[in-house]
């Protein structure tokens, strides 16, 4: 086995520390993002992760390029640090035997096959639990292991569309927009790693493993959070407000006199008063009945945001960022990845 990618700076930072999952061994049969990010979190916490890949081609994410480093796609590098990799033909008797011998030495088993595939390969939960009852077995799939939709294929962008996340993003007068990140994959993977850690703790007490069933659909529903509760509360979906926030004003991006953008967020009345009184020297905006309370500012969002836009257009971005921070207002320059 060889290390396929190691974050050297991370290793240097933690090499003198005791990590909470040291001594835990994970057999990782997952690929792309959700499963690999789950096991990468476990590796970062000290677990030894053995990644199983297809002979000749490996994880599909190796080929997701450009860009690439040393022939490896950026997707693969993003979600597979601190792991050991071995190529195994699981469809062969020898390959299956190797998987079983590895599983016998592991505490955790993670897979993200479509439901039914693990059983056909002979590495499903029931089979492994019968052989290794202490093994924590985590399945990551699109719609879960059971139910009328369990056999459907699914990827992050589809769930962003299907579960309503896209409908929340975009300008009020435009259509839905997909956030350009694999948000559902990432959230689902964190739920999976959290569940695995909880199951490991239970394993230490009971001596038994368990089957963890994590789905992208469940992750997508959870991501909706307060947006879902907004709908349950009033029966209407939250409006699209571009870079703003449906129930909090002011939140958004503003341009300074130099065209530079900065972002501020006043989530409490105290922060709002810091903005208009301390930073802008406009106590009248704190006293105006239209803007004095959060409900009024939400109702009069367009008028209020226009007032702020006019004020901020008088000075360059950096002037405002410094002044807002001095006043205790959460803010920051809008940067691209080069600048960040």
Predicted feature residues:
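Oxidoreductase and adenylate-handling cofactor-binding alpha/beta cores
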Residues: 189-209, 222-234, 277-282
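A short glycine-threonine-serine/GTX helix/turn-capping micro-motif
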Residues: 177-187, 209-211, 241-245, 249-251, ...
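Beta-rich nucleic-acid/ligand-interaction surfaces
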Residues: 220, 339-340
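Short Gly/Pro-enriched turn/cap motifs at secondary-structure boundaries
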Residues: 67, 76, 241-246, 252-253, ...
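Beta-strand segments within the central parallel beta-sheet cores of soluble alpha/beta enzyme folds
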Residues: 209-217, 323
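N-terminal helix-loop segment corresponding to the beta1-alpha1 unit
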Residues: 2-208, 240
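Active-site-adjacent beta-strand anchor residues
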Residues: 89, 111, 214-217, 264-266
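Aromatic-enriched alpha-helical interface/lid elements that frame and gate functional surfaces
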Residues: 250-327, 331, 338-339
């Amino acid at each position: 086995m060889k290390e396929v990618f190691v974050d050297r700076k991370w290793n240097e930072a933690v090499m003198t520390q005791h990590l909470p999952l040291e001594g835990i061994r994970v057999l990782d049969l997952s690929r792309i993002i959700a499963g690999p990010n789950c096991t990468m979190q476990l590796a970062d916490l000290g677990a030894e992760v053995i990644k199983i890949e297809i002979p000749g081609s490996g994880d599909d994410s190796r080929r997701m390029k450009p860009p690439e480093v040393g022939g490896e796609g950026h997707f693969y590098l993003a979600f597979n640090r601190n792991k050991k990799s071995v190529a195994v033909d699981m469809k062969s008797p020898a390959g299956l035997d190797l998987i079983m011998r590895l599983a016998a030495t592991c505490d955790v088993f993670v897979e993200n096959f479509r439901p039914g595939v693990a059983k056909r390969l002979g590495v499903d939960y029931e089979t492994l639990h019968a052989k290794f009852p202490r093994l924590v077995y985590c399945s990551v799939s699109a719609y879960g292991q059971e139910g009328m939709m369990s056999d459907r294929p699914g990827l992050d962008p589809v769930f962003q569309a299907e579960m309503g996340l896209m409908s929340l993003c975009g300008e009020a007068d435009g259509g839905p927009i997909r956030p350009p990140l694999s948000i559902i994959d990432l959230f689902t993977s964190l739920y999976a790693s959290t569940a695995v850690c909880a199951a490991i703790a239970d394993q230490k007490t009971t001596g038994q493993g368990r089957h963890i069933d994590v789905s992208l659909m469940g992750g997508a529903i959870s991501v909706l959070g307060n947006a879902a509760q907004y709908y349950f509360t009033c029966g209407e979906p939250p409006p699209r407000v571009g870079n703003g926030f449906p129930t909090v004003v002011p939140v958004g991006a503003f341009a300074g006199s130099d065209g530079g953008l900065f972002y501020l967020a006043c989530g409490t009345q105290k922060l709002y008063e810091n903005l208009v009184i301390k930073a802008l020297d406009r106590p009248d905006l704190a006293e105006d009945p239209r803007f004095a309370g959060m409900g009024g500012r939400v109702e009069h969002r367009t008028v209020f945001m226009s007032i702020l836009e006019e004020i901020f257009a008088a000075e360059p971005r950096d002037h405002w960022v410094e002044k807002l921070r001095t006043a205790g207002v959460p803010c920051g320059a809008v940067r691209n990845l080069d600048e960040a």
